[in-house]
């Protein structure tokens, strides 16, 4: 066996996953899976790391949840993640909540490599009728 083949054999295949970040104005959920999405590696939410209900969607709660999820994933041998950010979407809010950006930064700072970041918020193609009535919400 040549020297090149030995080096290739010694080099271990890197394990990558997908970080699904669901961020609404009520909570932030970080769910890390394998690349297929079938196997859950780690799952944390803002509500699991703070006591007060009003703090669940905060960037601080998202940061702590993402840090814990990243630590769990790295213990299981993951070196990097692709990120899918999702807002409630549909007939609800189409913008991610305050915890989305903080969660992405926390995953990177925890030591996970970041691959692709994409927005997977569901967009209605003439789905259900939005709340607010015929004349909309009057402010």
Curated annotation (Swiss-Prot):
Any GO CC annotation of this UniProt entry: ribonucleoprotein complex
UniProt xrefs under SUPFAM superfamilies: Translational machinery components
Domain of life the protein comes from: Archaea
InterPro entries given in the database record: Ribosomal_uS11, Ribosomal_uS11_archaeal, Ribosomal_uS11_CS, Ribosomal_uS11_sf
GO biological process: translation
Record keywords, A-Z: Ribonucleoprotein, Ribosomal protein, RNA-binding, rRNA-binding
Ranges where the record places region Disordered: 117-139
Gene Ontology MF terms in the entry: rRNA binding; structural constituent of ribosome
Pfam family, one: Ribosomal_S11
HAMAP family: Ribosomal_uS11
Subunit structure: Part of the 30S ribosomal subunit.
Family, similarity comment: Belongs to the universal ribosomal protein uS11 family.
Described function: Located on the platform of the 30S subunit.
Protein name: Small ribosomal subunit protein uS11
Organism, scientific name: Thermococcus onnurineus (strain NA1)
Organism lineage: Archaea, Methanobacteriati, Methanobacteriota, Thermococci, Thermococcales
């Amino acid at each position: 066996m040549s020297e090149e083949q030995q080096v290739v054999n010694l080099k271990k295949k890197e394990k990558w996953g997908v970080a699904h970040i669901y961020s609404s104005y009520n909570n932030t959920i970080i769910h890390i899976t394998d690349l297929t999405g079938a196997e859950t590696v780690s799952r944390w939410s803002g509500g699991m790391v703070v006591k007060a209900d009003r703090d669940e969607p905060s960037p601080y709660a998202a940061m702590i949840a993402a840090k814990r999820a990243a630590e769990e994933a790295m213990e299981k041998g993951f070196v990097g993640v692709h990120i899918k950010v999702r807002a409630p979407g549909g007939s609800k809010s189409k913008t991610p909540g305050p915890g989305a950006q903080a969660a992405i930064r926390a995953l990177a700072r925890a030591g996970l490599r970041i691959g692709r970041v994409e927005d997977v918020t569901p967009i209605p193609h003439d789905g259900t009728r939005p709340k607010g009535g015929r004349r909309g919400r009057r402010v």
